[in-house]
Swiss-Prot record:
This is Ribosome-recycling factor. Belongs to the RRF family. It comes from the Bacteria. It comes from Proteus mirabilis (strain HI4320). One of its GO terms (molecular function) is ribosomal large subunit binding.
Amino acid sequence: MINEIKKDAQERMDKSVEALKSQINKVRTGRASPNLLDGIVVEYYGAPTPLNQVANVVAEDGRTLAITVFDRTLAPAVEKAIMASDLGLNPSSAGAIIRVPLPPLTEERRKDLIKVVRGDAEQGRVSIRNIRRDANDKIKALLKDKEISEDDERRSQDEIQKLTDMFIKKIDEALTLKEAELMEF
């Protein structure tokens, strides 16, 4: 019973960390990265479709993304979707290939992005702590129902705290990496 609670908590914490990493990878740095455009949705035959399902996105060099659209007639819609996004990008089309040059980030914009990333990291920490609280509540309920001893309860809560510390450390490491990436010139 206790092992199931710990396993569930660990899986949920792992998902929280992965969600955070995915979230902060979408934040634009000065370097070209294909996952920068992951959140962009294109109108494809009247249905909103993720960009990566209608085109291939690759980093051409450090400051340019190249988008190869599978259906040439879709190129204008892809350009429009990129311009409508809040990424501040201006794509240029050359047939089926759309090039997206990434302008260098200003110091002020970098600091704003760091604030956003730190806020995302704090949300990740809060979700980890909420998972810890849920697991501890379940363990306390087992103690209350006399299914486990007080020693088992304490031992389990200590193990869950160690899990919590480990996952919060992973969040802090991801944050540190992203901050360093943002401050590179």
